[in-house]
């Protein structure tokens, strides 16, 4: 039967057979057909709805077929970039990681404190309980360690006893260098001996001379200064200069004698010698005060001096965390002998000076009862401290425990296993009570430093440039928190990401609220020119605490504040007032610094494409450092000017790591120069305006010594009335009254060291017409003194006299476009005919070294055109102090050279002091400079000028044809054949 089912070829020819698999296939295919039908129906419906937007039935070529949707269809609003090749360098990741700068040492969370921050904010409304103070001292005199005692006693944390915290050194490079770079404020609630709370706003400042700008900014917002002096080192020139500035600002000063432990451990002085050293240190400071009072012209009634008997002197050892005054030490005796019931204030008066204790009568007397009787300070103050040191350093644990019990000090057993320094810290913290005697410091500040309300009137007179009788100044003098809002800003602090800055300042009157719209007045703002003014909204307000911030809603008058959201409108300092203030508000005076930024370097990015990033970084550098100057030369190079090598080193570090995040190339450092004259112009110079309708005549001559410095220091101001200005010059420099009344301007700005005088005669010049052109003449004069003809450096100590002026009757013909460049050109010609010279900055160097290193210092200085002013021993120590002058051009690497020749025993501090003439004639073309050979002294001026001109992209030599008209050249050739070598 099966044979009938197949043909002869084996093919199946029988009946159809039902197959389950075929049914499944049919079901599957049928389902697909159903889906196609449904999609087709859907497409038909869509076509019906969309009309012309339906599916296109036209034939599509293979190469035009679209197999995948476009990126815009898939990702919507996202931007899609298509690149045909990989242009990203291998060193750069495809997806860059999120970078966080961990340069600042910040608190990860709000620290625990002994006070509540709401309580602190409440105390801001009580100006009588506020003290704004600034720490002042030389480098390594213990300011930051002293600040640590305030921080440790107000912040609850497990502070490591064997480690110095240096809490206000909140930058990583400050910790690495062991050097404070930035002034850091902190606001703390502290208690005095009566447990009364006060709000202390404290500014810890750098001690290095290069960072004096930070100290000046700190003093600008303070009412008093805490002068911290190391008892071994004593006074330094940096302290002298900063103390002079504090007295000029009418700030109250108190004294802290630090380093008491050094007399015992390092110098190993007997107690009697230690007393004499302490007394000498105080007398040295008082002698300096006497000299500064005479210099500043302070009234005799307002002069205060330091004495432990007055309570304005504190003795301290910041390393061992102890401090005391005479009164606080007498309180220790009162607590130790409660049965005696003596007056602590009376006892304190007997603990200083030539006072002795008579054991037989139990009384103090002026004469010693015995020949070897020590003074009361030695017997009752120093000897107990010496004994504590001796027992802690020399006794075994068991004996030391018994000794300490006798004076009421009980320690844990584990404390005796600590090293000697840590053990002494713990012992002294028990010996002097809470905080190692911190209430003694609080008492001194509260008693001697005025509150913001008490000092408001004096502060306003010093910092406000407006009318002192106006309503704005009246509110500031009364510290009226409901009056006009006035805020003085002095510093800018970057945020942790270094992309933005917050502005730090002091509220002088009114109350600053978050969300206020305020007017920001820049340093160039005036009532006549309001261009430097913007309106912004306050986004954030903080109390700045060094390593963390406390946000607040408002800050009343008398307090310090950190402001967020307005930094784009502020370069250095600014004045902030309410936007709705309709009063005529003038600015707070910009900060004035005793030194100058004379060291400069030229920089450029390693990758030229990163130039915009570097320029943005330079803007941030300009905000972060008060004394830095950044500018672009005509050659296109970017120049940074600073006070010294370490100052510039910190700036370049911040530019690379924080603000620019790029690699830069740095040129060799150079210095700023000035141009001056040493004689009067050989003839009356003249220049014609381009339209040949006006002619100006001028001569130049040297300015009297000291005039330029007085103008720069603000002792005389051009905005005074004419009588006041003339009185200054007639009384101080013997100017005749006519010349003093004829002063028109200072240059290159209103505080510049050059003077423009109208010396023309009314019989020769139409004074009314000349006065109409005064503004243009002044602008030309200031332009000329800003960029001198020798090498585009500032002109200094030159008096320019307008001798005559032939002016057109038509005002259009004598407009600013004609007069300004002509005034500049005639000033240049008068300058070049007055024997021009170059001036270079000279640095003052204070060198501390052992006596056997003094000879090596002389040798190092002699090779750098320097000379020693004096060298003298430091009393009570084995050190010598050498004072020397050194040209800034020769100061690069001086400190390294000095330490090399003294085996690291010498330490120096260098700062700008004055300007001096560079030897030689810069216009002497007979001088030939040989490459790779040092130029002799008479050739230095020529060498400096040529190298500066080459660096700035100027022509090789000064072109006289550029500054002299043809008639003037003919006059010169006839007048003096000796000048022919210049043409």
Task: Annotate each PLM feature.
Residues 197, 205-211, 219-271:
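Conserved Switch II/interswitch segment of TRAFAC-class P-loop GTPases
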Residues 275, 297-302, 321, 330-353, ...:
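Accessory interaction regions appended to the cores of large information-processing enzymes
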């Amino acid at each position: 039967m099966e044979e009938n089912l197949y043909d002869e070829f084996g093919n199946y020819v029988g009946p159809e057979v039902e197959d389950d698999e075929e049914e499944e296939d049919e079901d599957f295919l049928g389902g697909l057909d159903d889906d196609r039908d449904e999609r087709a129906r859907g497409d038909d419906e869509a076509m019906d709805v969309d009309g012309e937007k339906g599916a296109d039935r036209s034939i599509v070529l293979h190469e035009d077929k679209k197999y995948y949707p476009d990126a815009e269809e898939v990702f919507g609003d996202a931007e899609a970039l298509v690149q045909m090749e990989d242009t990203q360098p291998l060193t750069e990741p495809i997806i860059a990681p999120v970078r966080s700068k961990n340069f600042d040492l910040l608190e990860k969370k709000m620290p625990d404190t002994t006070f509540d921050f709401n309580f602190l904010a409440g105390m801001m409304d009580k100006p009588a309980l506020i003290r704004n103070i600034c720490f002042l001292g030389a480098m390594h005199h213990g300011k930051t360690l002293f600040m640590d005692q305030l921080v440790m006693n107000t912040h609850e944390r497990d502070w490591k006893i064997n480690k110095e915290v240096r809490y206000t050194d909140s930058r990583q490079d400050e910790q690495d260098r062991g050097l404070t770079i930035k002034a850091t404020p902190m606001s703390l609630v502290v208690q005095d001996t009566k447990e009364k709370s006060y709000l202390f706003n404290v500014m810890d400042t750098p001690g290095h001379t290069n960072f004096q700008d930070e100290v000046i900014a700190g003093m600008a917002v303070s009412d008093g200064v805490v002068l911290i002096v190391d008892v071994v080192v004593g006074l330094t020139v940096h302290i002298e200069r900063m103390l002079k500035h504090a007295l000029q600002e009418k700030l109250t000063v108190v004294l802290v004698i630090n380093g008491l432990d050094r007399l015992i451990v390092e110098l190993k002085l007997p107690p009697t010698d230690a007393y004499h050293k302490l007394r000498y240190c105080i007398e040295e400071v008082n002698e300096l005060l006497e000299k500064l009072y005479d210099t500043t012209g302070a009234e005799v009634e307002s002069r205060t001096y330091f004495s432990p008997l007055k309570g304005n002197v504190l003795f301290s050892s910041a390393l061992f965390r102890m401090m005391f005054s005479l009164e606080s030490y007498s309180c220790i005796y009162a607590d130790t002998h409660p049965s005696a019931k003596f007056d602590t204030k009376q006892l304190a008066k007997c603990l200083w000076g030539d006072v002795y204790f008579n054991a037989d009568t139990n009384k103090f007397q002026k004469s010693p009862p015995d020949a070897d009787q020590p003074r009361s300070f030695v017997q009752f103050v120093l000897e107990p401290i010496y004994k504590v040191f001796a027992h802690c350093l020399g006794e075994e644990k068991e004996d030391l425990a018994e000794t300490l019990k006798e004076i009421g000090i009980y320690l844990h057993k584990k404390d005796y296993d600590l090293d000697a320094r840590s053990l002494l810290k713990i012992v002294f913290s028990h010996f002097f009570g809470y905080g190692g005697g911190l209430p003694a410091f609080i008492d001194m500040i509260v008693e001697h430093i005025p509150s913001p309300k008490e000092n408001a009137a004096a502060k306003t007179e010093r910092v406000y440039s407006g009318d002192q009788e106006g309503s704005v100044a009246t509110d500031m003098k009364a510290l009226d928190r409901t009056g006009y809002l006035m805020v003085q800003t002095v510093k800018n602090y970057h945020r942790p990401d270094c992309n933005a800055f917050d502005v730090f300042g002091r509220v002088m009157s009114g109350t600053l609220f978050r969300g206020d719209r305020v007017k920001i007045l820049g340093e160039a703002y005036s009532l006549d020119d309001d261009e430097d003014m913007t309106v912004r909204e306050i986004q954030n307000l903080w109390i700045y605490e060094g390593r963390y911030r406390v946000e607040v809603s408002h800050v009343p008058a008398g307090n310090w504040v950190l402001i967020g959201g307005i930094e784009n409108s502020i370069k250095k300092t600014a004045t902030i007032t309410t936007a709705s203030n309709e009063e005529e508000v003038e600015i707070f005076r910009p900060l004035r610094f005793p030194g100058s930024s004379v060291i400069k370097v030229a920089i450029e990015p390693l990758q030229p494409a990163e130039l915009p990033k570097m320029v943005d970084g330079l803007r941030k550098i300009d905000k972060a450092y008060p004394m830095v100057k950044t500018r672009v030369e005509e050659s296109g190079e970017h120049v940074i000017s600073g006070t010294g090598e370490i100052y510039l080193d910190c700036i370049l570090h911040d530019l690379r790591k924080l603000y620019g995040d790029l690699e830069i190339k740095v040129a060799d450092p150079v210095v700023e120069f000035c141009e001056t004259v040493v004689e009067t112009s050989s003839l009356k110079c003249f220049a014609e305006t381009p339209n040949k309708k006006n002619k100006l005549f001028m001569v130049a001559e040297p300015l009297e010594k000291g005039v330029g410095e007085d103008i720069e220091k603000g002792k005389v101001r051009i905005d005074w009335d004419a009588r006041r200005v003339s009185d200054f010059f007639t009384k101080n420099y013997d100017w005749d009254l006519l010349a003093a009344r004829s002063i028109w301007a200072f240059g290159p700005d209103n505080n510049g060291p050059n003077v423009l005088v109208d010396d023309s005669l009314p019989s020769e010049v139409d004074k009314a017409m000349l006065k109409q052109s005064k503004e243009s003449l002044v602008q030309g004069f200031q332009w000329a003194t800003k960029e001198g003809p020798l090498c585009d450096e500032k002109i200094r100590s030159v008096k320019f006299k307008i001798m005559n002026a032939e002016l057109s009757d038509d005002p259009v013909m004598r407009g600013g476009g004609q007069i300004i460049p002509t005034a500049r050109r005639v000033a240049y010609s008068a300058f070049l005919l007055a024997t021009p010279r170059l001036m270079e900055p000279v640095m003052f160097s204070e060198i501390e070294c052992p006596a056997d290193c003094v000879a090596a210092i002389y040798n190092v200085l002699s090779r750098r055109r320097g000379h020693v002013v004096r060298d003298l021993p430091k009393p009570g120590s084995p050190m010598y102090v050498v004072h020397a002058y050194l040209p800034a051009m020769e100061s690069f690497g001086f400190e390294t050279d000095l330490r090399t020749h003294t085996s690291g025993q010498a330490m120096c501090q260098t700062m700008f002091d004055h300007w001096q003439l560079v030897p030689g004639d810069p216009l002497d073309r007979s001088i030939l400079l040989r490459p790779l050979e040092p130029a002799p002294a008479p050739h230095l001026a020529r060498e400096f000028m040529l190298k500066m001109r080459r660096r700035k992209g100027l022509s090789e030599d000064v072109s006289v044809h550029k500054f002299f008209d043809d008639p003037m050249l003919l006059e010169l050739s006839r007048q003096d054949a000796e000048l022919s070598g210049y043409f």
